[in-house]
């Protein structure tokens, strides 16, 4: 390399650094901190470093480039997603082995029985809505990926265990499998079900509750309408950081039909008066399958049950923590519902739960029901156990 070429190379390199540096410094025009973030306590420096790191263009370029190489060469994304066939994405929680999975299952089953007992003491009937895994409903799209053996019969084992304990858990797998012929019941790029899948589950729960735990009070009429259908970028695409440089590599967005459920005109006042201050017909506790309004699960339940439904579900905390929180609320203690539907995705049964925010003695009391009722549960007649299905 001649001296002039070396000078040109150095000049180009320095020029690129200056341009990238100036580009990053532009981000400080909208950089602001709180009053307690000062130079003296070091928080301002940390905040500035974090902001600069987030806005530095080379970082985004490197992230996009590395993600594109993983995606194209190895058919992989970041931890959290499994890439199937035909642009289908799955959460890795439905594939990975779980440390201490068997012990976690035993602990969680004990808590489930304890929750059932706590509800019954207040006069509430537990209806456990076990949501089948996406891999169980759409195994044809998982490709060469194989779930760990723990997941093979997890749904069936879950149902068998709660049936032995005498817990009412209508089967949701069979109706969801049947509904696949009419439309998509789970989103292709998301962890969750579609509004149609949520409606199928709600109808099954409504029919089962009407048969085995009919609600008291005057039925209410609800109507569901489609609002709009729009492209929807599922939560699993966040594990494919290809935007903005390689966004063309991302799976195409799902088409999500949003729905809205409202009381039939003239019914709202009567229904509100019936249950106001005296009785709550149905409470719903669960995960983002229930908490996220995009799926309209609450609305579908209202229409299927012909009753108002009070939603206590939470996004991002699994099914057990929201239920334990609900049991400690004044709403439950003062106005317990006739029925509590507990939406519980099957993959959370072997998952570990951090229960540090709860009183250990109270948790121990809840778990005691497994020991005191074990013999009764083993002799109980199974109520509704689904047939074995391939994963």
UniProtKB/Swiss-Prot annotation:
Endpoints of the signal sequence: 1-35
InterPro entries (UniProt xref): AlgJ, ALGX/ALGJ_SGNH-like
Entry keywords, A to Z: Acyltransferase, Alginate biosynthesis, Cell inner membrane, Cell membrane, Membrane, Periplasm, Signal, Transferase
Name of the molecule in the record: Probable alginate O-acetylase AlgJ
Segments passing through the bilayer: none
Annotated localization: Cell inner membrane; Periplasm
Functional note: Together with AlgI and AlgF, forms an inner membrane complex which probably interacts with the alginate polymerization-transport complex and adds acetyl groups at the O-2 and O-3 positions of mannuronate residues. Acetylation of alginate is important for the architecture of biofilms and increases the ability of alginate to act as a defense barrier.
Active site positions, chain numbering: 190, 192 (proton acceptor), 288 (nucleophile)
Pathway recorded for this protein: Glycan biosynthesis; alginate biosynthesis
One term under GO cellular component: periplasmic space
Lineage, highest ranks first: Bacteria, Pseudomonadati, Pseudomonadota, Gammaproteobacteria, Pseudomonadales
Family the entry assigns: Belongs to the AlgJ family.
Primary site of residence: membrane
Enzyme Commission number, as recorded: 2.3.1.-
UniProt cross-references to CDD domains, sorted A to Z: AlgJ_like
Disulphide linkage map: none
BP terms from Gene Ontology: alginic acid biosynthetic process
Organism of this sequence: Pseudomonas syringae pv. tomato (strain ATCC BAA-871 / DC3000)
One GO MF term: acyltransferase activity
Main EC class the enzyme belongs to: transferase
């Amino acid at each position: 390399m001649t001296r002039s070429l070396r000078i040109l190379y150095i000049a180009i390199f320095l020029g690129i650094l200056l341009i990238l540096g100036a580009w990053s410094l532009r981000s400080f025009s909208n950089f602001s901190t709180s009053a307690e973030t000062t130079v003296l306590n070091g928080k301002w420096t940390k905040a500035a470093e974090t902001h600069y790191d987030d806005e530095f263009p080379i970082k985004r370029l490197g992230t996009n480039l590395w993600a594109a190489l993983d995606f194209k060469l190895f058919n992989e994304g970041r931890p959290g997603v499994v890439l199937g066939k035909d642009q289908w994405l799955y959460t890795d929680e439905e594939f990975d082995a779980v440390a201490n999975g068997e012990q976690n299952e035993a602990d969680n089953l004990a808590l489930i029985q304890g929750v059932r007992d706590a509800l019954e003491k207040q006069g509430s009937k537990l209806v456990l809505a076990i949501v089948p895994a996406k891999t169980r409903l759409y195994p044809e799209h998982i490709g060469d990926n194989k779930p760990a053996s723990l997941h093979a019969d997890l749904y069936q084992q879950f149902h068998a265990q709660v049936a032995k304990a005498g817990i009412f858990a209508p089967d949701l797998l069979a109706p969801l499998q049947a509904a696949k012929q009419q439309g998509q019941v789970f989103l292709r790029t998301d962890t969750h079900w579609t509004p149609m899948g949520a409606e199928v589950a709600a109808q099954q729960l409504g029919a089962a509750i009407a048969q085995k735990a009919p609600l008291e009070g005057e039925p209410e009429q609800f109507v569901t309408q489609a609002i709009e259908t729009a492209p929807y970028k599922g939560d699993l695409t966040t594990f494919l950081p290809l935007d903005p440089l390689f966004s063309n590599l991302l799976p195409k967005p799902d088409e999500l039909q949003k729905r809205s459920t409202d009381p039939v005109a003239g019914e709202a006042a009567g229904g509100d008066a019936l249950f106001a201050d005296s009785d709550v017909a149905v409470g719903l506790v669960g995960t983002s399958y229930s908490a996220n309004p995009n799926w309209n699960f609450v609305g579908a339940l209202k229409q299927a049950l012909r009753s108002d439904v009070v939603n206590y579900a939470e996004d991002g905390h699994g099914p057990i923590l929201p239920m334990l929180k609900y049991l400690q609320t004044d709403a439950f203690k003062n106005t317990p519902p006739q029925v509590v539907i507990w939406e519980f995705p099957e993959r959370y049964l072997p998952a570990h739960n951090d229960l540090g925010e709860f009183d250990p003695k109270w948790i121990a009391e809840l778990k005691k029901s497994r020991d005191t009722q074990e013999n009764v549960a083993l002799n109980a007649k199974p109520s509704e156990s689904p047939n074995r299905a391939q994963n």
